[in-house]
């Protein structure tokens, strides 16, 4: 059971890193297309991430 939780946590972590890298690349491409304009976006990712991790460790 513990190894399953570790595996799930590892997959979540790697998915988060992958998603972050894709978002950065997409933002760079959009900035290039818009002539250097930068859009401000409010990101609310940490709240759901913390609740998911808490539910994972409650078990």
Swiss-Prot record:
Major location category of this protein: secreted
Position of the signal peptide: 1-22
Pro-peptide positions on chain: 23-42
Species of provenance: Rana dybowskii
Tissue specificity remark: Expressed by the skin glands.
Entry GO CC: extracellular region
One record GO biological process: defense response to Gram-positive bacterium
Subcellular localization, as worded in the UniProt entry: Secreted
Annotated protein name in UniProt: Temporin-CDYd
Pfam families, A to Z: FSAP_sig_propep (PF03032)
Source organism, top-level taxon: Eukaryota
Family (UniProt): Belongs to the frog skin active peptide (FSAP) family. Temporin subfamily.
Alphabetical keyword list: Amphibian defense peptide, Antibiotic, Antimicrobial, Cleavage on pair of basic residues, Secreted, Signal
Protein role: Antimicrobial peptide.
Matching InterPro entries: Frog_antimicrobial_propeptide
């Amino acid at each position: 059971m513990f190894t399953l939780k570790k595996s799930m946590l590892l997959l979540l972590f790697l998915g988060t890193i992958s998603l972050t890298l894709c978002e950065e690349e997409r933002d760079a491409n959009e900035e290039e297309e818009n002539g250097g304009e930068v859009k401000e976006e409010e990101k609310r990712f940490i709240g759901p991430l913390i609740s998911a991790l808490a539910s994972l460790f409650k078990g």
